[in-house]
Amino acid sequence: LKTFCLFLQIAVFIALGIQIFLCGTDALNNENELFSVEYCGANCTQQDNGSWTKCKGNCTCYHEDGKRYGLCLSTEYTDFTQFPKPTSEEIADASPRPKETNSH
């Protein structure tokens, strides 16, 4: 039962992350801006002293009020208007190329 509850919690948090992502991008309503949320593959817990276990890297602990457990998530906002528009040549240079094969 405890494993099922943990699985259910993770599913809810992932759904919440997706909802935040969709609401964030819809609220911006601008293709030049992007807000993304990713699950970092780890959980966090509240210690007896009230502090929370640390998440690694750029991840932050997100939890519901009153709960002693949460998920490590990374969030990122990108405003593409801060970058110049690429030229056709830059786009061509960045495009994937077919893999070259040696014939025998």
Swiss-Prot record:
Localization of this protein: Secreted
Keyword set includes Chloroplast: no
Region (Disordered): 85-104
One Gene Ontology term, aspect cellular component: extracellular region
Keyword line: Disulfide bond, Glycoprotein, Secreted, Signal
Signal sequence region: 1-27
Keyword Disulfide bond found: yes
S-S bridge residues: 40-59, 44-61, 55-72
Glycan attachment residues as annotated in the record: 43, 49, 58
Gene Ontology molecular function: any one: C-X-C chemokine binding
Function: Salivary chemokine-binding protein which binds to host chemokines CXCL1 and CXCL8.
UniProt protein name: Evasin P1174
